[in-house]
Design a protein with these regions (language model features):
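FIC/Doc superfamily catalytic core
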Residues: 1-136
Length: 136
C-alpha cells in the first residue's frame, strides 16, 4: 500500500501538469465546475449526434477536453480512457483499447489536439476489437 494518494477519488487540491504538454491544466478551484460543465456539454452534444462516427468524434473531442481539465491529482489518463470505454458502451459503438505500446503515440495526438488523426487510429482499433468480439 505504498505511494497511495491521500486525495484519491477527490478533485485535485494542488496544481498539476502533464509532462510534455504545451498547456496548463485547470486550477484546483476550477476543476469541479469545469468537470460539471464538461459532463453536461458532453451529454448534450452526444444527443445531437446522428450516427456512430459523429458519436465517436464527440467522445474523442470530449476526451481531449477532459485531459486538459485534468481534474484529479493522479489517474486522469486512466480515468479518461475508462470514460471513453464507458461512453462507447453507452452509445452502443464498438469500444477500443489503447495498448501500452501505443501510449506514446496517443499522448502525442492528445498534445496536438488533432482529433482527425486520433479518429483514424481509433477506427483501426475498433475494427480489431470488433473482430475479437465477433469470435464470441
Amino acid at each position: 500500500m505504498d505511494r497511495l494518494n491521500d486525495n484519491a477519488g477527490n478533485f485535485k487540491r494542488n496544481s498539476n501538469a502533464i509532462i510534455g504538454a504545451n498547456f496548463e491544466t485547470s486550477t484546483p478551484s476550477q476543476a469541479q465546475i469545469l468537470t460539471k460543465n464538461w459532463i453536461e456539454n458532453l451529454n448534450y452534444r452526444l444527443e445531437l449526434c446522428k450516427n456512430d462516427d459523429e458519436k465517436l468524434l464527440e467522445i474523442l473531442n470530449s476526451h481531449i477536453e477532459f485531459e486538459r481539465i485534468h481534474p484529479f491529482s493522479d489517474g486522469n489518463g486512466r480515468t479518461g480512457r475508462l470514460i471513453m470505454m464507458y461512453l462507447c458502451f453507452q452509445e452502443k459503438i464498438t469500444p477500443f483499447v489503447i495498448e501500452k505500446e501505443d501510449i506514446a503515440l496517443y499522448m502525442s495526438y492528445l498534445r496536438e489536439q488533432n482529433v482527425d488523426i486520433i479518429f483514424e487510429k481509433v477506427k483501426e482499433l475498433q475494427k480489431f476489437e470488433q473482430k475479437r468480439i465477433d469470435k464470441f
